A protein has these predicted regions:
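Structured, active/binding-site neighborhoods that engage oxygen-rich ligands
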Residues: 1-324
Length: 324
């Protein structure tokens, strides 16, 4: 059941927050159909683009089923909705419980960190892929707080400063987009303004600046790099003609398609709102129940990993986080 609407939360803000979560889930599911493939392989199989959420992919999922990316995001979202605050200790426990559920996929950096062996050199995208709930919860909070929480969350698994800084910038950008309703160009200028006052890793700064005029040239050879995902998301923010086309174009680039599209989808959804979501994507996500015993389900998962209550989670996070 949806959370009662807070009278101070404008309908447009609620729409953009829901768009952010739905965008995360849709990009993840769409990208999972062709994960690890090259863009040439994808174009040969989908000459018109990957456009429908469907059963299949390398992990044999049902339409709308989250991968590790969004299962972890849902774990964070459930904590925020329940506690009404970000707690690194509780979130870390949730991630550990998730790992103990035997997920069908898990990044090496995440697995090692949750098992007590963090990799200080990894610049993988596993923290950025799950951070969108902090953008939703933080839409009514101070930017400095959102950035601090996002850095803490990254540090649970990804200790390299590039990962922490990318998390901070992206979560704050999502929160700003949801609250203010800015265009992609306006958001980009806002982001550059923040960066002028921050000490950032040179590679991160370069990726953000490059996004103004080009998408990542190669999503395959450095598959899983956080700056590929970030640069692509920002490029789509600036250049994609619509939410749908930005997500589809991301998937068509190949490589770590589910993660890149989850990240881009969260940002595009935060800009365009839930109304921009194709109806088929929305229906697949909100009716996805990968339960044991269903003959259609080849990869069953615990109920807390299902996306069926995604909109209720968004409403609860907004309610708990809103401080106008």
């Amino acid at each position: 059941m949806a959370c009662p609407e807070h009278t101070d939360i404008p309908a447009e803000v609620r729409s953009r927050a829901r768009g952010c979560m739905l965008g995360q889930l849709a990009g993840d599911s769409l990208g999972s159909l062709v994960e690890f493939q090259t863009k040439e392989q994808i174009r040969a199989e989908y000459p018109g683009g990957v456009r429908l959420l469907a059963d299949g992919g390398p992990f044999d999922l049902i339409a709308g089923q989250p991968t590790d990316d969004s299962e972890m995001a849902l774990a964070m979202a459930r904590g925020l909705a329940s506690l009404g605050r970000y707690c690194a200790m509780q979130t870390g426990k949730a991630y550990r419980s998730w790992l103990d559920s035997a997920p069908f996929d898990c990044g090496v950096t995440i697995r090692n960190a949750l098992n007590g062996a963090p990799n200080p050199t990894s610049q993988a995208n596993g923290a950025l892929m799950r951070v969108s709930p902090l953008g939703i919860f933080g839409a009514g909070r101070k930017r400095a707080d959102v950035m601090a929480w996002a850095k803490k969350d990254a540090a649970l698994t990804h200790v390299h400063p590039v990962c922490g800084q990318a998390n901070a910038l992206f979560a704050a950008l999502l929160a700003h987009a949801i609250r203010e309703g800015a265009t992609g160009a306006e958001l980009y200028e806002t982001l550059l303004g923040w960066m002028k006052r921050m000490k950032l890793e040179p590679a991160l700064r370069e990726a953000v600046e490059r996004a103004a005029h080009e998408k990542p040239r190669d999503c395959q050879s450095q598959m899983g790099w956080v700056l590929i995902a970030l640069q692509n998301a920002l490029w789509q923010m600036l250049h994609a003609p619509s939410f749908e086309e930005g997500v589809v174009d991301t998937v068509m680039q190949g490589g770590d398609t589910d993660t890149n599209a989850a990240i881009a989808g969260a940002l595009l959804g935060a800009i365009h709102g839930e109304e921009a979501m194709p109806a088929q994507w929305r229906e697949a996500i909100l009716n996805c129940r990968p339960e044991l015993g269903n003959p259609r389900v080849r990869t069953p998962r615990p109920e807390y990993c299902w996306p069926v209550d995604a909109l209720e989670l968004v409403d609860k996070m907004l309610e708990k986080g809103w401080k106008p």
